[in-house]
Amino acid sequence: MPTTRFLTNREIYEFAVLKLVPSVRQRLWIATADIKDMYVEKPGLTKQMVPFLQILAERLKQGVAIRLIHAKEPGPAFRQDFDRFPGLWSGIERVLCPRVHFKCIIVDGKRAYFGSANLTGAGMGAKNENRRNFENGILTDDPALVEPLAEQFDSVWRGAWCGKCGRREYCTDCPLS
């Protein structure tokens, strides 16, 4: 029986970032409007904080296919962290689409988080409780929710909207170009 859970604030970090993302086996799809250099707890004996990009780089080494859609160029701190993990350059598939405002994490096409939180420390609840945003979202394995979410992600990925998009001059990654 499918399970669906409503998450707020710190729960997004605990369930979507610390549990859902590490459970990926084959493919990880992430969509966000904003992306920053988020630091997360690395699973293990010590509570070491590492860049979320390190977690993604480790998943790539394990053979996970990762796709990222984001709406704007990340800032210098993110790019600096990105450069620390050379496997990300060739391993992560990325599309910049300035019209993307939906936020989701889809794991193996079977489980997903979707909601208001951008892929930032404040958005995903990774920051101190007095510094994080007020966010909410849904964590689910219900195919009735995961499948249309994956279709929305894939339609943007494929460029299904690019032909009629009025913002192509701002889009550096249009698949139709």
Question: Where in this protein do the model-derived segments appear?
Answer:
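Signature of lipid phosphatidyltransferase scaffolds
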Residues: 111-177
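Short, conserved active-site loop motifs that form the nucleotide-linked donor/cofactor pocket
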Residues: 3-4, 91-93
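Short, electropositive alpha-helical surface patch
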Residues: 79-91, 167-176
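Short beta-strand scaffold segments in enzyme catalytic cores
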Residues: 103-106, 136-138
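A conditional alpha-helix N-cap/helix-loop micro-motif detector
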Residues: 9-10, 46-49, 94
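Primarily the HKD phosphodiesterase
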Residues: 20-89
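Short solvent-exposed loop/turn micro-motifs enriched in small/polar/acidic residues
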Residues: 95-99, 131
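Short beta-alpha junction loops
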Residues: 70-75, 99-100, 143-144
